[in-house]
Regions:
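Non-catalytic, glycine-rich low-complexity segments
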Residues: 77-130, 193-196, 205-207
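Substrate-binding/active-site clefts of carbohydrate-active enzymes
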Residues: 201, 208-283, 288-410, 428, ...
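Active-site-proximal helices and loops of the catalytic beta/alpha 8
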Residues: 317-332, 337-355, 402-405, 413-510, ...
Length: 688
């Protein structure tokens, strides 16, 4: 970027963000060596006494990426983004000296090596790339294992067998012809198993207040329940703006994020259900529906009541029933880390102080206090409207678990949980939460808001999936942007790294998204401009490419309302905030883009391989990237993508491949157009 770099230090979560000076090398780069414990590490470079705002895209210190070796970026909580890397444990050493060169790693108690998906037991091992010629799982019978994933210096080999598998060995013939035997191993008695229904779904996120106003008669109720009525640090200020109502197409005002209401409601959702079904949607994730003090709903006033601005319980039950009749399952958004000011326990603490039985539900620093004063109690993000709950308190835990059970009994099919890593004793709480919820409703789908790749939440005892920004934003979005820094080969390696880290059961249930209510819109991220801009044909093409990649991955593709319409929307750092949440202007939808999303959903129904839990890397060259979906053999799908505006070619695997969209068969080579993609279906058996 032409900047004269005078000093660089490394600061991160591994050293409590203390300074670790880096040294300038002869080639002009800066480096430092540090020994780290296994796990996910967040960090930034401190350059010339300044922090880069975004380690993945900073015009001052390096664009598109300050550290080209970073595996992705995650929100730093201050309007910027930290880079992160996952530090892998050292590979276990096999007992035989001759096998050391393999770096063979397999542990049947680790879910990434053994889990159940699609009714089969997946058994995998890792080895150094290029060292394994063939491998077999032996358990009375001999089952060939096949190369599944390749990235960096590692490979993953895999086989799927009956879940009734008993004791087994893994035999490997290395590249020199030597044979090695590992084991015996015993699979876990109750391996982590995927919910079979999840991976067949097509997801859609609904921010209800901005989805559609089906009943204007309830609009005024938003003002009656708004935070303003409880926040004395706000409502005692005569010059402060008040919450207000807007017409559906009114421009965003300064408090667009939170207290400008447009009237979206459950009646509007019911009116749009036929549209969702036509688009192929079969899973809806609602942002918070319960009584709260804002448009976003993350400041809960009553966990057991529907927000009056949306409707009531009777209307919610009708909405769930009608969705289920159309084959659409529904998740609700749960906020256990903090409440709003109107929550009964907080109001009791406000009035009674230490005498309140709920005093220890919060972290009160002084009393009496003014509600809304963030210096008086711990609050999420320092916002006085969001007092933090003490989830280490047994009473708080019991309340939150019973709330979750109540809504599952009511008819919801699963739960998305907000900021799970910020709870007190989070892992302990969610282990108990999962046990009780799965005992009540074993098929409930449990999703955690974690932005980076972090398998610690996905060991079979807490969550079924994370919100996979680590796939959607850190991999798919960066590939869809194009450019040499995120080539097809890098895209494929990053995908392989993710799927090697996670159990196959986790891959099968992946909640895969690129954008949401917390990010800029996909079109904006791909160069399509902001809320009122007219996007270029290239930007729309990149959206189509990103969607085609996401729909081809294991798990559930999830898009934010209106993404299929081709809407832009920024996430600015100054008012008006959260333009990506502007109401969906349905009359401005782009029919050709809606047709694209509908087509992708139809292909997932028509091609069983696209809903398989299995992804196998094939090839990445320059702008082209290709992976295989499903078990090898007739019907497997080769998904091929080109992120360049120039045409590109790819050598195909042996055999005949039928284009899923066109009546055409390919052999030998495929030419892809600008920003093109293809799903090719194998005709006949695979040739190994």
């Amino acid at each position: 970027v032409g900047l004269e770099v005078r000093s660089v230090s490394l600061r991160g979560s591994f050293n409590n963000w203390a300074e670790l000076p880096m040294q300038k090398q002869d080639n002009g780069t800066w480096s430092v060596s540090v020994e780290l414990e296994p796990g996910v590490v967040q960090y930034k470079f401190f350059i010339n006494g300044q922090w880069p705002k975004n380690m993945c895209d900073d015009p001052t210190f390096g664009t598109p990426q300050v550290d080209a070796e970073a595996q992705g970026c995650v929100d730093d909580g201050y309007g910027g983004f930290n880079a992160f890397r996952e530090i892998q444990p050292q590979a276990s050493q096999p007992p035989q000296d001759a096998a050391v060169e393999l770096d063979f790693t397999h542990d049947p108690t680790a879910v990434r090596f053994v889990s159940v998906a699609a009714g089969r037991l997946s058994v995998r091992f890792e080895a150094k790339a290029g060292t394994v010629k063939e491998a077999f799982l032996e358990a009375g019978e001999r089952y060939p294992m096949h190369l599944q994933l390749s990235y960096g210096e590692l490979e993953v080999w895999r086989v799927a067998v009956s879940p009734s598998l008993g004791e087994y060995r893994i035999r490997v013939r290395d590249s020199s012809g030597r044979e090695h035997s590992f084991g015996p191993f015993s699979p876990p008695q109750r391996p982590f198993a995927a919910l079979d229904w999840v991976g067949r779904q097509v997801g859609y996120q609904i921010f209800l207040e901005r989805f559609w106003n089906g009943d204007p008669s309830n609009d005024e109720k938003a003002l009656a329940t708004d935070e303003y009525n409880f926040n004395q640090a706000w409502n005692k200020d005569p010059g402060a703006p008040k919450p207000f109502l807007s017409r559906w197409s009114d421009p965003p005002a300064g408090d667009h994020c939170c207290h400008q209401y447009y009237g979206g409601d459950l009646a509007g959702f019911l009116q749009k259900l036929p549209y969702l079904q036509e688009q192929g949607v079969s899973l809806v994730y609602f942002n918070p529906l319960f009584d709260s003090g804002s448009a976003h709903g993350y400041d809960t006033h009553d966990y057991l009541q529907v927000s009056p601005k949306f409707g009531d319980k009777a209307l919610l039950r009708k909405a769930l029933d009608e969705a289920h009749k159309r084959g659409i399952r529904v998740l609700f958004d749960f906020v256990p880390n903090h409440t709003g000011l109107g929550f009964f326990a907080f109001q009791d603490v406000l009035k009674r102080g230490p005498a309140s039985p709920y005093w220890n539900w919060y972290f009160i620093k002084k009393w009496p206090f003014v509600p809304g004063d963030a210096t008086a109690y711990e609050a999420w993000g320092g916002f006085g409207s969001l007092p933090k709950l003490n989830t280490g308190n047994p009473g708080v835990r019991r309340y939150l678990i019973e709330v979750s059970k109540y809504w599952l009994r009511f008819g919801f099919d699963g739960i998305r949980v907000d900021v799970v890593n910020e709870l007190i004793d989070a892992h302990g709480f969610f282990a108990q939460w999962r046990r009780e919820l799965k005992a009540l409703k074993p098929e409930a789908y449990l999703v955690a808001e974690i932005w980076q790749r972090d398998p610690s939440w996905l060991q079979g005892d807490e969550f079924d999936s994370l919100m996979n920004y680590a796939i959607g934003r850190d991999v798919v979005l960066r590939y869809a942007r194009g450019g040499a820094l995120f080539s097809g080969s890098r895209m494929l390696a990053e995908l392989a790294r993710v799927y090697a880290t996670y159990a196959e059961a986790v891959a099968a249930m992946g909640f895969n998204l690129i954008g949401s209510h917390d990010t800029a819109r996909i079109l904006t991220d791909l160069g399509g401009g902001g809320l009122r801009d007219t996007p270029s044909a290239e930007a729309l093409g990149r959206v189509r490419l990103a969607a085609a990649v996401l729909y081809a991955l294991p798990g559930v593709p999830v898009f934010f309302q209106g993404d299929e319409c081709g809407f832009g929307g920024e996430k600015p750092s100054s008012p008006p905030y959260d333009l990506h949440r502007y109401p969906v202007q349905w009359e401005r939808c782009k029919p050709e883009l809606q047709a694209h999303f509908k087509q992708l959903a139809l292909l997932r129904k028509e091609l069983p391989a696209l809903t398989s839990p299995v992804l196998r890397t094939y090839k990445g060259e320059a702008s082209v990237m290709a992976f295989l979906r499903g078990e090898a053999g007739e019907g497997e799908v080769l998904a091929v993508f080109n992120n360049s505006t120039d045409p590109a070619r790819l050598e195909l695997p042996p055999g005949a491949w039928r284009d899923a969209l066109e009546a055409r068969t390919y052999r030998g080579e495929l030419e892809l157009p600008s920003l093109g993609w293809r799903y090719l279906v194998r005709m006949g058996s695979a040739q190994r």
